[in-house]
Amino acid sequence: MIRLGIFIGLAVGLATVAHGEEVQVAVAANFVAPMQQISAGFKERSGHQISIISGATGKFYAQIKAGAPFEILLAADVATAAKLVAEGDAVANTSFTYAIGKLVLWSARENFVADGVDLLKRATFDHIAVANPKLAPYGAAAEQTLKTLGDYEALAAKIVHGENIAQTYQFVATGNAELGLVALSQVIDENGKLKSGSMWIVPQKFYTPLRQNAVLLNKGAERAAAKAFMAYLQSEPARRIIERYGYGLPP
């Protein structure tokens, strides 16, 4: 009922917009594929254009503190949005969980990944790609997984760090690492099918839940288009897209 109210409010708000605007949205790298579809739907309904800037959540935090022109942040964690609100860089009471991410062990090679637990324990590979745990929440989740399942000291010498989850994926896709811990959304299509290679979905008991929060930043506080997108992100059309890419949804 709450989401229905949000969507009705959005429809009314869009009717009052005289012309389309462009909204600057900083998007955690794992969420780019669904975001492209969501922003297309939003443009069709509202006339507003979304400018997607993708990267690591930790890096976005630093850029926002330095005055970057982002109006909305779609983070890969909960803490960053909360911190920005507490520090006065984002609007209070606008943060919400838009997706719950899932981590996968993925290889571009078919049949390379079957039993992920056994593969990580044996560590018979040369390189494993992991996002920088200091900048990327998916990297922190990957590090937790490796420490839980494998001999981390032995694995550490094999780790290749990507600045964000997109670069981590590229290391594996190009063969610079035999496998990597990446986001499920990166390796499946919009119908939930594996696009290529082989994967093992990491059980969520091995890492802290990847709850991903959006927040309206100060630069978007007075922008009708930014507020409209925050509402649209919680609408049923957006939620259906998010779910198709393998994410969990908040109630």
Protein language model regions, located:
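Bacterial N-terminal signal peptides
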Residues: 3-15
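A subset of signal/propeptide-processing and intrinsically disordered low-complexity segments
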Residues: 16-17, 72
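Exported/periplasmic ABC-transporter solute-binding proteins
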Residues: 20-54, 58-68, 75-78, 82-251
